[in-house]
């Protein structure tokens, strides 16, 4: 698959060949769903357990006599009705993450990239380097590219410092290094923008 390489100013340059094994697959909704669900559950923190009546460190002696006291019947002070007692039906410790085979994770990334490429939502630019790290100037450049409400920029080993500074306050603009490319961020972006370095890194990562 060939695609035009642009600049941040919107000027077209030479073509670049994209590996069909990475950018030419047919996306499957079930694979993308599995990977996104795995990602979201992986970043979710574990549930903290509350202490129930068996976990509370209080005496187990019966509180008062069973009959003749003129008050309600009680067992011990660990009951949920008392201040300092255990929680009734409280949450238990639980982790929400589950495992997913590396081959499925890699396949999901390939399909997410392929979906953007086939849908015309993939843009390849030469570099993210800016002469001046000015937010206003960058916003003007991106407005000419018509990237939609949410754009994801992926660079090589690291996002260029000038672009990272200029785009930090732009709503709907996210930037990641190639190592941080993931299915969730790619799928939710309207447009995916890759640099030449990012294309090389992603192809090496997916075929490695």
From Swiss-Prot:
GO terms for cellular component: ribonucleoprotein complex; ribosome. One of its GO terms (molecular function) is structural constituent of ribosome. Residues 47-58 have a biased composition (Basic and acidic residues). One of the primary rRNA binding proteins, this protein initially binds near the 5'-end of the 23S rRNA. It is important during the early stages of 50S assembly. It makes multiple contacts with different domains of the 23S rRNA in the assembled 50S subunit and ribosome. It holds the Pfam family Ribosomal_L4. The gene is rplD. One of its GO terms (biological process) is translation. Keywords: Ribonucleoprotein, Ribosomal protein, RNA-binding, rRNA-binding. Gene3D superfamilies: 3.40.1370.10. Belongs to the universal ribosomal protein uL4 family. Residues 47-84 are annotated as: Disordered. HAMAP family: Ribosomal_uL4_B. This is Large ribosomal subunit protein uL4. It comes from the Bacteria. Part of the 50S ribosomal subunit.
């Amino acid at each position: 698959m060939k695609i035009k390489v642009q600049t941040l100013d919107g000027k077209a340059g030479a073509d670049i060949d994209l590996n069909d094994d990475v950018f030419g697959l047919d996306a499957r909704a079930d694979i993308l769903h599995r990977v996104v669900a795995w990602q979201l559950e992986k970043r979710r923190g574990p549930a903290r357990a509350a202490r129930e009546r068996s976990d509370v460190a209080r005496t187990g002696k019966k509180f008062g006599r069973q009959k003749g006291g003129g008050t309600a019947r009680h067992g011990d002070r660990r009951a949920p009705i008392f201040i300092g007692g255990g929680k009734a039906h409280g949450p238990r410790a639980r982790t929400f993450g589950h495992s997913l085979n590396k081959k499925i994770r890699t396949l999901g990334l390939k399909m997410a990239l392929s979906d953007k490429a086939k849908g015309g939502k993939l843009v390849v630019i030469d570099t993210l380097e800016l002469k001046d790290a000015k937010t206003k100037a960058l916003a003007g450049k991106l407005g000419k590219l018509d990237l939609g409400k949410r754009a994801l920029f992926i660079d090589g080993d690291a996002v260029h410092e000038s672009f990272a500074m200029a785009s930090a306050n732009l709503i709907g603009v996210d930037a990641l290094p190639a190592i941080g490319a993931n299915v969730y961020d790619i799928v939710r972006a309207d447009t995916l923008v890759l640099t030449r370095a990012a294309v090389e890194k992603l192809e090496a990562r997916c075929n490695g």
